[in-house]
């Protein structure tokens, strides 16, 4: 990924290309109950049906594994990116993917996931998911890309995070332009439509 900032006027003037790949951030744990797994499964199927390539963190556990398996079972193309240290953990890496990129560390993982995706969607997850989303949002703020950044706020999962964003904006730490880059969707259909919006 070219990490040289572009002028903000250039980024804002760029038309978004029709996405061919979507990078999805989500938890390496399943979460409480079945609703999160069902959401990840639905997203995987929707991405495959939409003829989009799924890029994700390369694990076979938690929501990540559910997401990938659903896309694969629906005939989709799935690309995983995982740090080499994780490959030593039994059952961590998903070896049934279309492609699995093994990189040196977490920094390379995030950079390659960002480079390979034309859009970003965050499903429920923990601190790693939040970090990944905020990193690509920050890169958008800095003019490094013009890719849509979507929070899938199913069942108000991200309400506390959105409250933080609003509070930081009110207190002058997040600009209105950056706040507007956070695309909030309530369901899978809305998220897919959002990343395809010009």
UniProtKB/Swiss-Prot annotation:
SUPFAM superfamilies, A to Z: MCP/YpsA-like
GO cellular component terms, A-Z: cytosol
The entry's keywords: Cytokinin biosynthesis, Hydrolase, Plasmid
Keyword Hydrolase recorded: yes
Induction (UniProt): During the interaction with host plants.
Membrane-spanning segments: none
Residues holding substrate: 91, 109-110, 126-132, 138
Catalytic reaction equation(s): N(6)-(dimethylallyl)adenosine 5'-phosphate + H2O = N(6)-dimethylallyladenine + D-ribose 5-phosphate; 9-ribosyl-trans-zeatin 5'-phosphate + H2O = trans-zeatin + D-ribose 5-phosphate
InterPro entries recorded: LOG (IPR005269), LOG_fam (IPR031100)
GO biological process, one term: cytokinin biosynthetic process
Main enzyme class: hydrolase
Enzyme Commission (EC) number: 3.2.2.n1
One Pfam family, short name: Lysine_decarbox
GO molecular function: cytokinin riboside 5'-monophosphate phosphoribohydrolase activity
Further facts: The FAS-operon encodes genes involved in cytokinin production and in host plant fasciation (leafy gall).
Function: Catalyzes the hydrolytic removal of ribose 5'-monophosphate from nitrogen N6-modified adenosines, the final step of bioactive cytokinin synthesis.
Family, as annotated: Belongs to the LOG family.
Name of this protein: Cytokinin riboside 5'-monophosphate phosphoribohydrolase
Organism: Rhodococcoides fascians
Gene name as annotated: fas6
